[in-house]
A protein has these predicted regions:
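Divalent metal-coordination and catalytic microenvironments
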Residues: 181
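Short, low-complexity, Pro/Ser/Thr/Gly-rich segments in the mature regions of secreted, periplasmic
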Residues: 184-188
Length: 189
């Protein structure tokens, strides 16, 4: 499809098509999420960008996501207070775009991500309540895929087997041709 200018964005240009003369802001700016409940449900955020507008909140910042389309895409909204990188469409401060997030300190990095030794490949997704998914290239029992709930229930799939725990003592292990329930209380070969 051919790109069509947004008719609601006439503020970017005069009626004759000439660019408006106002301060332009190019590049990325540090911001903070003030509101993540978008009334239009489009993944927009209200942010504060001190280097551009001081303490005044921006208009709704459009998301820049890796995949988006009709009934498909990736949605991951940061919490209020999170650090976000903000750009401005054609440099116009009235049209912010949130393009990603950053951690303000090492204490903010998800705990599951810290379980992977530095230098080894892993991808971690973790919610604020500690529900998480880790995909790791670590060899053996510490690698593979791990789903973990906030209460400790886990599902681990790796080269050594499949391990399911409910976080309350029950466990199911599938290793080779053997199924073990509750640490050997029942073994099926």
């Amino acid at each position: 499809p051919e790109f069509q200018p947004d008719p609601q964005r006439s503020d970017l240009h005069h009626a004759n098509g000439a660019r408006m003369s106002q301060q332009r802001y190019y590049g990325k700016y540090r911001g903070m999420v003030l509101n993540n409940i978008d009334p239009m449900q489009q993944g927009r955020l209200q942010v504060q960008v001190p280097d551009v507008a001081g303490l005044v909140p921006t208009s709704w910042a459009m998301p820049c996501v890796p995949v988006a389309g009709i009934q498909n895409g990736m949605v991951a909204l940061p919490m209020i207070g999170s650090g976000v990188w903000v750009e401005f469409e054609q440099g116009n401060p009235d049209h912010p775009i949130w393009v990603g997030c950053f951690w303000g300190s090492a204490a903010e990095i998800p705990a599951l991500a810290l379980a992977t030794p530095p230098g080894l490949s892993a991808i971690t997704f973790q919610t604020p309540l500690q529900n998480g998914l880790t995909i790791s290239d670590l060899p053996g029992p510490t690698g593979g895929i791990m789903l973990k709930s906030a209460t400790g229930a886990t599902l681990i799939v790796n080269d050594t087997g499949i391990y399911i725990q409910n976080g309350k003592g029950a466990m199911l292990t599938l290793v080779g041709p053997t199924v073990t329930i509750n640490n050997g209380a029942l073994t099926v070969i």
